[in-house]
Amino acid sequence: MRTIEFDTHFYKKLWTLMVPIMVQNLMLALVAVADAFMLGGMDQNYMSAVSLATQIQFIQNMFLSAATAGLAILGAQYWGKQDIKALDDIFALAIRICGIVSVLFFVACAFFPRYLMLIFTNEPVLIDYGVNYLKIASFSYLLTGFSQCYIVMMKISEHAGTAAAVSSITVLINIVLNAVFIYGAFGIESMNVRGAALATLISRVLELMLSITFSYRPGYILSLIHISEPTRLGMI
């Protein structure tokens, strides 16, 4: 009769990886809830317009998730082998792919927001609010791909807790700035949908800064590698 043995060390390590990722996903979901709650409290049209506009970001995230999933799978294998050269090449390729995707979505949202909103609605009011949101939020789309690459690299090097902390801090600041800019506070006038977009942009800038800062600390992958010279020259 076979007996089932539990490797407590394995499950403890698995738990330390699972919990930060769960917390990170929960915090990201809270941003959407906060946006809907705050904007919906002012005007249902604000909430509807932003909900439609953020569908574009959802599509972008699908492309970025595919690229970063490949980075995570291959990167974890090479991290286990301590093949730093391969990690260097994979990270450089992921940065390039995510950079191209981010630039394409930025250009589309910054210069053609009205055409994008027409895909989702014909209501002039919703289109106008959506355009106001996308013109500001588009700059955050330019940064998202890069920060996701750095966060994945932190997870690969067994620093999922740090990645979750970066995302959680970013989300909390986003929610606070939402309240400040949407409702108006500390001498700042109410900016409604533009306030939500500005809060998103500032939080994304902070997320990228924190991700880069932590990623190059001793013990993290990026303290050991550098972006390949050919890829760096070929980047946008």
Please place each PLM-identified region on the residue numbering.
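Single conserved hydrophobic/aromatic residue that forms the stacking wall/gate
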Residues: I225-I236
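Helix-terminus/linker motif at the lipid-water interface of multi-pass membrane proteins
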Residues: L26, L30-S48, M117-P124, V180-M191
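C-terminal transmembrane helix end/exit motif
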Residues: M1-R2, L201-I225
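Short membrane-interface helical motifs at transmembrane helix boundaries
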Residues: L104-K135, Y183
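Small-residue-rich hydrophobic transmembrane alpha-helices
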Residues: M47-F111, T144-A163
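N-terminal membrane topogenesis motif
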Residues: M1-L26, R232
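Membrane-interface helix-loop junctions in multi-pass transport and translocation proteins
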Residues: L172-L208
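Interfacial/gating helices of multi-pass transporter permease domains
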Residues: L39-F58, V125-Y129, V193-G195, R232
